[in-house]
Amino acid sequence: MAALRLLAWALPRGVSALRPRPALPHRLIRRYVSDRSGSVHFYTDPVKAVEGVKDGSTVMLGGFGLCGIPENLIGALKTKGVKDLKIVSSNVGVDDFGLGILLASKQVRRVVCSYLGENALCEKLYLAGELELEMTPQGTLAERIRACGTGVPAFYTPTGYGTLVQEGGSPIRYAPDGHLITLSEPREVREFQGRFYLLEHAIRADFALIKGWKADRSGNVIFRGSARNFNVPMCKAADISVVEVEEIVDVGTFAPEDIHIPNIYVDRVIKGPKFEKRIERLTTRDSKPAPGSKDNDPSRTRIIKRAALEFQDGMYANLGIGIPVLASNYISPKMTVYLHSENGILGLGPFPLKNEVDADVINAGKQTVTVVPGGCFFASDDSFAMIRGGHLQLTMLGAMQVSQYGDLANWMVPGKKVKGMGGAMDLVSSKKTRVVVTMEHCTKTKQPKILKKCTMPLTGKRCVDLIITEKAVFEVNHSKGLTLVELWEGSSVDDIKATTACSFAVSPNLKPMQQIKLDA
């Protein structure tokens, strides 16, 4: 209150906001800052910084993969030995770093996340009944967190309609013998303007552990590169937010317009004693394909070169890992395509040279990347606002199965393989965004992947617009079904019928499968 009285006294009526000199005398600025900094506590010991986290606490962990994770604070939780934690995280990283450390020490009861990635330990604990796993679409997770921070108890979203997210029944906990103990609950559904939406509730936490780049001595925080991700919304959504940073600077170092998290959201700050900043998938421009990689497979290259024809000048597009990302290598230099990454980048560039590698700049596949001139970074809640709001013209992704009416399944094989839906459910939920699937026509065991009805849990219902395989290209009509529009020269219509487990029409203008030319 003393600070407010000073402000009221020192700001005369009618003073222009554009006056070049400060509104307060320097001595009053110093006094105001001194008064304000008392509400943000600074620590030197990570264990003391997480004081109050107890058995059964709900803890949000910022970061995406290994980028922007609060590694010192996670280590402090390990040291404290608190158990039965409910962890909210975008994904679970790797076995021996970040959240994986807490999983290995059996300190976590439940994980709420969107993607397991390559964390084999988490998948093993889950399938063995030692860990509860609440899989949530990444954009929905970001919005549930953001909603809590803004005082909104619930909201409606189109993401997940027609899937296990809406219907319930997604496995949360298995028994050691493999039978299901806990399943997800169905969502309330409501229709708005002819579309169906799910009711999702805000998610709160006792603590949020955040990784920033720098903080000033009043608690304002800034980030580097794509490390904003889930850190920004999480910092606003917990009862107590603890931010570890690489550097603490004097007040006034940051221009007011450059501050990413105002100190009103910050309770505790610590300068991390050390940072490993491990990179999950180090990828450089001159990286060679790993042994056994399919990158040079002729069939795969055929899909890539066909997929590249879907890009248009001025387009905003999101590309899944694998074939979709590789298709971007064939974008004509005469064309500008703005590539979006769910973790908070618009304007993805090529993979970096070895001397350009930056642990704070990764894509949604956790690969090191660069950003083109004019590109930008933002938090995960903003990223999915772009996606859900229909601001992308194209999303291209892989699939395990696609139905004849455009249903998509690509995130789970019940009881066997659990990777998570990541941002895929959000990406296919906007009616304004064209969805292109790139995949091999059949499985490794020669089973068709294009079916009358998907047998695996759906990612989206009637959402796919085009299917590209090494054999053919299908256009998808969500009410009439598939039409074969292009055919690879080594295939025949009879061959496609034999390897496709549903009926389809053949275009009267059927043509050879198109391929982008390198000089295009």
From Swiss-Prot:
Record's GO cellular component terms: mitochondrion; motile cilium
Pathway of action: Ketone metabolism; succinyl-CoA degradation; acetoacetyl-CoA from succinyl-CoA: step 1/1
UniProt catalytic activity: a 3-oxo acid + succinyl-CoA = a 3-oxoacyl-CoA + succinate
Known function: Key enzyme for ketone body catabolism. Transfers the CoA moiety from succinate to acetoacetate. Formation of the enzyme-CoA intermediate proceeds via an unstable anhydride species formed between the carboxylate groups of the enzyme and substrate. Probably play and important roles in the energy metabolism of spermatozoa.
Protein name stated in the entry: Succinyl-CoA:3-ketoacid coenzyme A transferase 2B, mitochondrial
Gene: Oxct2b
Species of provenance: Mus musculus
Recorded family membership: Belongs to the 3-oxoacid CoA-transferase family.
Pfam families, A to Z: CoA_trans
PANTHER family: KETOACID-COENZYME A TRANSFERASE, SUCCINYL-COA:3-KETOACID COENZYME A TRANSFERASE 2, MITOCHONDRIAL
Active-site positions on this chain: E342 (5-glutamyl coenzyme a thioester intermediate)
Enzyme class: transferase
